[in-house]
Amino acid sequence: MTSPLHATGGGAHPHAALTGTYLDGAHLDEGVANLRPDYRALLIVAIGVRGGPSDAASDEALTRAEALAKARLNGAPPESLPEIAAWRDAFLGFAVKPRQARSSLEALLRRVDAGLPRIDRLTDLYNAISIEHLIPLGGENLDRYVGPPRLVRAHGDETFETVADGIPT
């Protein structure tokens, strides 16, 4: 994993130090890298982005993404797309059966016909980007993040919190 670029236009970006605190310790575990040497991670820190409930702009982005996905699929299942087939192959490398754990992209594509849920502005936007570019994409609230981001191979006994409507489940 490479370090983020902290400069633009020849001068230091005003948020470079803050961005560095989030990304400098980012780590892709050797166990993941060995299973998928072709895997690349891209981490982006967005500072000053306003969250909040879904709005007209995020709804429009998802509506465009839904239309694009329907046109690409043309009635075929998501796994017919080469990008989805590649992610299924990656999951098999992690000893995960594709029907038991799908990439977030495949899960979104499977929901397109019924309409994608509108969750909140940021989630709606990264879901739209995921569909438009056919890449699994996610987001985290870095104000609540503990430690640097890391991607490790799960053992299966990990605990994690899930949240629905802002309430831990």
Regions of interest found by a model, annotated:
Residues 2-169:
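Charge-biased, low-complexity intrinsically disordered regions
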